[in-house]
């Protein structure tokens, strides 16, 4: 017991309980679970220690009882559940004592009942610990999300990345880029092409009008920028060169007025963060290599470059650095490569390395602010998803699948919620959650997918059938349902046929259930043996009859009708083979067919024609 009391989890638990003079079951479980302690193993000993400390352990049921009892004592005379007056102080004490006696047993049973491998129970327990939000808190979180998104958007619109990225968007919308979407040339799947086409339509609708007027100037600016890059000019020249700076400011002022969509904000911000990671990696690599060569500045770098070119200085470098010339050359080359990559990044972002890192840090702060507020709003409303999902059980999907689909709808609701309209978030989110759940039932509940509009028609027929069953006391006919819905009888029958559920091939058949339904279903992939035999006999008979014809007529018929498994050749193709005209081949074919129509030959094939 002494060793147990010295463990961090139990020490924290006792400290917390001594301050409050009481503790609840949930608090005991949460504190132990926070320190990674198996609750069920230590629960007996922990409860004994709490009893020795004269600390009361209350269950959640007891807290509810206490609230109810004292509400009855303080309020007006009310029914006590059996028509009596409010509880007296003695009855209150008796009930609380009875509850205390059961507290220990309740806690032990709860710990055993929640299995560690039951994800549904664990999930429901976790989301139950989240506190609900007030309308003011929802507005505050929405404002924080808006603020985080605003930080990211401001950084992107003020950065030099905006102009090159919009130039690439404009180029992707040009006619040359459209040719790449040809499946024959691209070698991509239909899905990939359709997704790219959808994204292209979105970009064209959002930015097409602006880019149509700015693209020629953007192309001219990018050409000037490329010339400066090829000359080896530093990135600061973009702000110092008068012509480039004038063109750049003009284009940026136009692009900053464009309303960026969420897809572009997300893509640009991810590019900033990914590039910042690359920059930090390049700088670490460069610092490591410079330490190996004892380079402090650019002057030392040039000295090593000159030293490697002169044999006498090369030997001195080897002696100073303690490595071979080849190794020095390799490290020197690596430094040059990293320097070129960093310079390339500066030109792509039209900013210095320090400026890019500073912007990336600001974007990261905006992302953290946005994510924290978004997660808080989502977690506080997970119980709403569960309550809505309960209404859609037994419709083809498991309860937990419905909850997860509803969670997807909740995430979309958080992203699209407009707090300025004055509605409470739960009112708005309910519609998104319902839509996500009903759509998932329509798409996934059936083995064979049925379109959503057909699902709606099936629901109408089912609803009317149920109402007519209650009205007539019997199953309604198709005509009665059609009359009620103002449909045709054929449409009702069609909807009913679509509504039929698939049946398993393993369904047992017969009284003894010694066979399954699959045993009686013909295999469409296997050809009927009698038909195969019949075709072989027909082939042999035709070959025998054709052998009685002259060789030329036999060959013409074989080529014209593709009797050897080849395709049927045209008169012109057969004529080229025999080096005669099309008309001559037609005459030979007609003569051969006339011979075959003789009863002596046709009688042999008549049986095959009847079958």
UniProtKB/Swiss-Prot annotation:
Sample GO molecular function, one term: sigma factor activity
Entry GO CC: cytoplasm
Assembly, per entry: Interacts transiently with the RNA polymerase catalytic core.
Gene3D superfamilies (UniProt xref): RNA Polymerase Primary Sigma Factor (1.10.601.10), Sigma-70 factor, region 1.1 (1.10.220.120), Winged helix-like DNA-binding domain superfamily/Winged helix DNA-binding domain (1.10.10.10)
Protein name per Swiss-Prot or TrEMBL: RNA polymerase sigma factor RpoD
Region (Sigma-70 factor domain-3): 456-532
Keywords, alphabetical: Cytoplasm, DNA-binding, Sigma factor, Transcription, Transcription regulation
Region of interest called Sigma-70 factor domain-2, as start-end residue ranges on this chain: 377-447
GO biological process per UniProt: DNA-templated transcription initiation
Entry-linked CDD domains: Sigma70_r4
DNA-binding stretch(es), residue numbering of this chain: 571-590
Pfam families referenced in this protein's UniProt entry, alphabetically: Sigma70_r1_1 (PF03979), Sigma70_r1_2 (PF00140), Sigma70_r2 (PF04542), Sigma70_r3 (PF04539), Sigma70_r4 (PF04545)
InterPro entries referenced in this protein's UniProt entry, alphabetically: RNA_pol_sigma-70_dom, RNA_pol_sigma70, RNA_pol_sigma70_r1_2, RNA_pol_sigma70_r2, RNA_pol_sigma70_r3, RNA_pol_sigma70_r4, RNA_pol_sigma_70_r1_1, RNA_pol_sigma_70_r1_1_sf
């Amino acid at each position: 017991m002494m060793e147990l009391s010295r463990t961090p989890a139990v020490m924290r638990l006792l400290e917390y309980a001594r301050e409050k003079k009481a503790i609840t079951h949930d608090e005991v479980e949460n504190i132990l679970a926070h320190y990674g302690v198996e609750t069920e193993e230590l629960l007996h000993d922990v409860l004994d220690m709490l009893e020795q400390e004269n600390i009361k352990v209350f269950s959640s049921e007891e807290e509810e009882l206490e609230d109810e009892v004292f509400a009855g004592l303080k309020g007006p005379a009310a029914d006590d559940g059996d028509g009596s007056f409010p509880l007296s102080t003695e009855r209150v004490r008796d009930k609380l004592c009875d509850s205390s006696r059961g507290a220990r047993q309740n806690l032990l049973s709860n710990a055993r009942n929640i299995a560690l491998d039951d994800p549904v129970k664990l999930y429901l327990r976790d989301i139950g610990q989240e506190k609900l939000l007030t309308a003011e808190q929802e507005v505050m979180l929405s404002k924080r999300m808006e603020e985080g998104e605003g930080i990211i958007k401001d950084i992107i619109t003020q950065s030099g990345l905006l102009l090159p990225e919009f130039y690439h968007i404009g180029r992707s919308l040009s006619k040359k880029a459209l040719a790449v979407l040809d499946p024959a040339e691209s070698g991509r799947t239909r899905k990939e092409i359709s997704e790219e086409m959808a994204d292209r339509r979105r970009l064209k609708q959002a930015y097409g009008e602006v880019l149509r007027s700015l693209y020629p100037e953007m192309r001219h600016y990018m050409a000037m920028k490329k010339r400066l890059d090829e000359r080896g000019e530093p990135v600061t020249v973009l702000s110092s060169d008068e012509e480039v700076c004038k063109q750049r400011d003009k284009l940026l002022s136009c692009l900053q007025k464009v309303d960026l969509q969420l897809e572009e904000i997300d893509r640009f911000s991810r590019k900033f963060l990914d590039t910042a990671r690359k920059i930090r990696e390049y700088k670490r690599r460069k610092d490591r290599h410079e330490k190996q060569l004892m380079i402090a500045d650019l002057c030392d770098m040039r000295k090593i470059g000159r030293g490697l070119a002169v044999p006498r200085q090369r030997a001195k470098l080897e002696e100073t650095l303690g490595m071979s010339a080849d190794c020095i050359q390799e490290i020197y080359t690596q430094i040059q490569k990293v320097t070129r990559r960093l310079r390339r990044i500066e030109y792509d972002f039209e900013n210095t390395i320090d400026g890019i890192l500073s912007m990336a840090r600001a974007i990261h702060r905006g992302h953290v602010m946005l994510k924290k507020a978004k997660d808080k709003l989502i977690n506080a409303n997970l119980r709403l998803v569960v309550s809505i999902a309960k209404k859609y059980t037994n419709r083809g999907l498991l309860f937990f699948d419905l909850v997860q689909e509803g969670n997807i709808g909740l995430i979309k609701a958080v992203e699209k919620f407009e707090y300025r309209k004055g509605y409470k978030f739960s009112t708005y989110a309910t519609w998104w959650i319902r839509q996500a759940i009903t759509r998932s039932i329509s798409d996934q509940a059936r083995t064979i997918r049925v379109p959503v509009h057909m699902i709606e028609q099936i629901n109408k027929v089912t609803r009317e059938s149920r109402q007519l069953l209650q009205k007539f006391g019997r199953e309604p006919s198709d005509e009665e349902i059609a009359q009620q819905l103002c449909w045709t009888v054929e449409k009702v029958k069609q909807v009913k046929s679509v509504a039929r559920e698939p049946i398993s091939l393993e369904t047992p058949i017969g009284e003894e259930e010694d066979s399954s339904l699959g045993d009686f279903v013909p295999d469409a992939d296997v050809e009927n043996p009698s038909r195969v035999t019949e075709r072989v006999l027909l082939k042999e008979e035709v070959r025998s009859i054709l052998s009685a014809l002259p060789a030329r007529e036999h060959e013409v018929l074989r080529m014209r009708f593709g009797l050897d498994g080849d395709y049927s050749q045209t008169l012109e193709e057969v004529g080229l083979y025999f080096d005669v005209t099309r008309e001559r081949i037609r005459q030979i074919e007609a003569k051969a067919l006339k011979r075959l129509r003789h009863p002596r030959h046709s009688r042999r094939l008549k049986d095959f024609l009847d079958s």
